[in-house]
Structure formats: structure tokens, C-alpha cells
């Protein structure tokens, strides 16, 4: 459903900042960096007050809003609860609705129901009823959602498109797309005006049912309504489904209409259109929109570069992708390996593993972080071409890359191929070192010992008995392949 969502103005505004601004310590600046969901924000709130610093309701509400936007729901709930319990803010139905929604996100609708039931009657209005409906819809509880919806209608609380949109989202999320248009029709019959989002949900439903004709009809309906202002997102959503349906000419028409409604400095909008043009294979349009985005958005964030690079790689425009990567390097943006890795993957896709390896080596030489997965990707490309010496070299590098708390397990096919090669070609010392590193990633297996035995036999076989004992200790049984390898020893 992400394609349907409205892009909030504050998300667009957040793309721009002044690097020379003097940072002032605020409650927001104290809470915002606490990204660990297991850590509580209560100590920061209490410490702020105990130090005699002022706290405003407006700032607290802004903090809750920001934390919700960043999906830090537990922290947002803690701030909201602290506001209420300390009396800093006397909750109106609006604050109760936000709090109820957060409870539903963190603890589920059962706990949200309890909060709702304990509210005074004066606070049970369209906002709090709507928040509880959100909780039911989010957890896809159809029975409770529809019963609650009917109760809201009985109480006269269904006077805007928001509630109907929730029910349409419910049907979308459970895959009952055929019911979405019926809700839209009911909305019109009840003289509740649909908004752009209502129509986008409906367009999405028709798209899921491969009904391009009704998508076109919905667009015409919107264009006729004086209370609807057509926006770029609606045309873009429709264009996506025309691309899916193979009607590329109509898709291009809709993309042009979408572009004409883009607001300046709307980088997210340009990014979305770039990805759709890439799906159509239209390199000129991708580059044209990228140039426009650079003109109107004076600062490009890493996500912008990622979007255009992924689009260029998708249409095999690697030369242009290299140029964009050069722009990114000189942009002053913080380093993000995903950006160069997009081009690296593009090289691999075009059997240019030497260039991919060279880029990784350049990054490592300049002290920039890479990932074992990227080195493994290059190693796999070499192995598939039979260039196993290069595959071995890349795998050694991959095993030496710091992965932190993440777990990385190289593919078994690649590991088996490299072990077989290094057993035949590498020194015993090389094999010992490689196997020791590999064991830390995937544990021990028979192929590791076969590589060690083969290498040792080539160097005289002085350690065979020790290796066989180690196999036994590791509970690895000698099989027919092991016996064949052992038979290659020279007789004493």
C-alpha cells in the first residue's frame, strides 16, 4: 500500500538543512537520537524537568508526531503517557486518539479497547472512535472493524472520507479488492465526498484485478469533480498499473500528467517517476527527470542517488550510472555503501566482475566500508566462469570484512567450488587459514577436510593422521570420496 500513501509535507521539508546552523540543545535533540527501541525515553524526560528546563506542550506534541513518523511507536507512546500522567498536557479527544492509536500499534487492539472503554464519555467522539477503528483495521480484524464502523455510522461519526478509507484499506489488505469500489459507491450515496486517497485506493483495487478500463473510468470521474484537485501521485499510481498491463503509451501519457502536477522541491515525486520510466526502459526520460530534480532540489540525499542509480542499472545504462556515482562522491553526502553497491551489482549483471572487484578494492583502499555479501557476489561471478583463483581471493576478503552483529553465510555451492580449487591448488598454509575463517561463518563440513587432506598430500602427507583424527573429533565420517582422496598418497 506504500504506493497509495500521501507524502507528508514535513517529509519533503526534512530534505533541506543548513550545515552552518548552531545546534541548540532541546528536549527533541535529547530524545531523537535514542534509536534503540529497548531503551526508555523516561529518564531523558525526567532529567530534563529535574534540571529546571522548560518543556512546552507544542514541543512534546511535535516529538510524538516525529517519533510516530519514524515508526518509533513505543517511544512516542512513552512521551504521550508522560505528558498525560504529569499533567503537562490536558488531553483533548485529539490527544486521546493519538495515544489510543499508539497503544494499538505497540500492544494491539485489545489493550486499545481497554483504554477506549475507560475514557470519559465526553472524549468518545469521532476522533477516538476513528483511532480504535484504525487499530482493528491494522490487525485485519474484519468482524470488529465492520461492527465498529456500523456503530460509528449510527452515532453520526462517519462524516468524512477518512473512515471509509479505513474500510477500503481493510478490504485491500485482506485481498478482497472487489469490495473496495462498493465502499466508494456507498460513500457517495451517503453524500460523503471521496478524497484523492479514496480514489487511489480504488485505483489500486482495479489494478489488482487487472481492470484498466475501470482505472480509466475512475480517473475521468475524479477529473470531473470540482472538489478534487488532481495530484501527481494519483496519475503515477494509475501509470504503474498501465505499465503492469502492457499499455505503455497510456502509461507515458499519465506520467506526463503526473509530472505536470509535481511541486517544486518534491524529490520523492521525481524519484517515483524516475523508477516508473525505468520500468518502461526510457533512459532519456530517466536522465531528463534526474536533471530536473537536480535543478529544483539543490541538495540530493542518498536516497535520491540510490533511486536514479537503481533505475539506470535496471535499463543497463552503466556509463550514465558511473557518471551519477561520480556526482555522488563529490556531493558531500555521508558515505552509504548501498550507493556504490548498486553499480557493483550492475557490473555483475553484465558479467563485468573485474570492474566490480576493482570498485570494491578502491573503496577498501580508501577506508570505506564494504560488505561480505558484495565480495561474495563477485566471487560467485568468477566461480561461474571457472576463474576460481579470483573467486578464492574475493572469498578471503569477504571473510575478513567486519560484519558486526549481523550473520553472513556464504552460499554452499560457492564454498564447495572454492574449497575444491584451493585443495587442488593452494598451499596447506593457505587452506588452513581459509578453513579457519570459514568455520567461523558456517561451521565445519567434510569439504573443508577434503581440501586440507588434498593440500597436505601434495606437500608430502605428513599431517594426514592428525587431520583424520580432527575429522573424527568433529564427528565427520570418512566416506568414499575421502577414501579416493587418501588413495592418491604416495606409498611410504
Curated annotation (Swiss-Prot):
Transit peptide: 1-17
Molecular-function GO terms, alphabetical: mRNA binding
UniProt keyword annotations, A-Z: Mitochondrion, Repeat, Transit peptide
InterPro entries according to UniProt: Pentatricopeptide_rpt (IPR002885), TPR-like_helical_dom_sf (IPR011990)
KW NADP (keyword) present: no
Localization in the cell: Mitochondrion
PPR repeat ranges, renumbered to this chain: 125-159, 160-194, 195-225, 231-261, 266-296, 301-335, 336-370, 371-405
Pfam families registered for this protein in UniProt: PPR, PPR_2
GO cellular component terms attached to this protein's record: mitochondrion
Repeat recorded as keyword: yes
Family from the record: Belongs to the PPR family. P subfamily.
Protein name, per record: Pentatricopeptide repeat-containing protein At4g21705, mitochondrial
Organism: Arabidopsis thaliana
Amino acid at each position: 500500500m506504500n504506493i497509495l500513501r500521501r507524502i507528508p509535507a514535513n517529509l519533503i521539508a526534512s530534505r533541506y538543512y543548513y550545515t552552518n546552523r548552531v545546534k541548540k540543545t532541546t528536549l527533541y535533540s535529547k530524545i531523537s537520537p535514542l534509536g534503540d527501541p529497548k531503551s526508555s525515553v523516561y529518564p531523558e524526560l525526567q532529567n530534563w524537568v529535574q534540571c529546571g528546563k522548560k518543556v512546552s506542550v507544542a514541543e512534546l506534541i511535535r516529538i510524538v508526531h516525529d517519533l510516530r513518523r519514524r515508526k518509533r511507536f513505543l517511544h512516542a507512546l512513552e512521551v504521550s503517557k508522560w505528558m498525560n500522567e504529569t499533567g503537562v498536557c490536558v488531553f483533548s479527544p485529539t490527544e486521546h486518539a493519538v495515544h489510543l492509536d499508539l497503544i494499538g500499534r505497540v500492544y494491539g487492539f485489545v489493550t486499545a479497547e481497554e483504554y477506549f472503554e475507560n475514557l470519559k464519555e465526553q472524549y468518545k467522539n469521532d476522533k477516538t472512535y476513528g483511532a480504535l477503528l484504525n487499530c482493528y483495521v491494522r490487525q485485519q480484524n474484519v468482524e470488529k472493524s465492520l461492527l465498529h464502523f456500523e456503530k460509528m455510522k449510527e452515532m453520526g461519526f462517519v462524516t468524512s472520507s477518512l473512515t471509509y478509507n479505513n474500510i477500503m484499506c481493510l478490504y485491500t489488505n485482506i485481498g478482497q479488492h472487489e469490495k473496495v469500489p462498493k465502499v466508494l459507491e456507498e460513500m457517495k450515496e451517503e453524500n460523503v465526498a471521496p478524497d484523492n486517497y479514496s480514489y487511489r485506493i480504488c485505483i489500486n483495487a482495479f489494478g489488482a484485478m487487472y481492470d484498466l478500463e475501470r482505472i480509466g473510468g475512475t480517473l475521468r470521474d475524479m477529473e470531473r469533480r470540482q472538489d478534487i484537485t488532481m495530484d501527481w501521485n494519483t496519475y503515477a499510481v494509475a501509470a504503474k498499473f498501465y505499465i503492469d498491463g502492457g499499455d505503455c503509451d497510456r502509461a507515458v501519457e499519465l506520467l506526463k500528467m503526473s509530472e505536470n502536477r509535481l511541486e517544486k522541491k518534491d524529490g520523492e515525486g521525481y524519484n517515483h517517476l524516475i523508477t516508473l520510466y525505468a520500468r518502461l526502459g526510457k533512459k532519456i526520460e530517466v536522465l531528463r527527470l534526474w536533471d530536473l530534480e537536480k535543478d529544483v532540489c539543490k541538495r540530493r540525499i542518498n536516497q535520491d542517488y540510490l533511486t536514479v542509480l537503481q533505475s539506470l542499472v535496471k535499463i543497463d545504462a552503466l556509463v550514465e550510472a558511473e557518471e551519477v556515482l561520480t556526482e555522488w562522491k563529490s556531493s558531500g553526502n555521508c558515505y552509504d555503501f548501498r550507493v556504490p553497491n548498486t553499480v557493483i551489482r550492475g557490473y555483475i549483471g553484465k558479467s563485468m566482475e573485474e570492474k566490480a572487484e576493482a570498485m570494491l578494492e578502491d573503496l577498501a583502499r580508501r577506508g570505506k566500508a564494504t560488505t561480505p555479501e558484495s565480495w561474495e557476489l563477485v566471487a560467485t561471478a568468477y566461480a561461474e566462469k571457472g576463474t576460481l583463483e579470483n573467486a578464492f581471493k574475493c572469498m578471503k576478503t569477504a571473510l575478513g570484512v567486519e560484519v558486526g552483529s549481523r550473520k553472513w553465510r556464504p552460499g554452499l555451492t560457492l564454498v564447495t567450488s572454492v574449497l575444491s580449487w584451493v585443495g587442488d591448488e593452494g598451499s596447506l598454509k593457505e587452506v588452513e587459514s581459509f578453513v579457519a575463517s570459514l568455520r567461523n561463518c558456517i561451521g565445519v563440513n567434510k569439504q573443508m577436510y577434503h581440501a586440507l587432506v588434498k593440500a597436505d598430500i601434495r606437500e608430502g602427507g605428513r599431517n594426514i593422521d592428525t587431520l583424520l583424527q580432527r575429522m573424527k573429533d568433529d564427528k565427520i565420517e570418512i566416506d568414499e570420496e575421502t577414501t579416493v582422496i587418501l588413495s592418491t598418497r604416495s606409498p611410504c
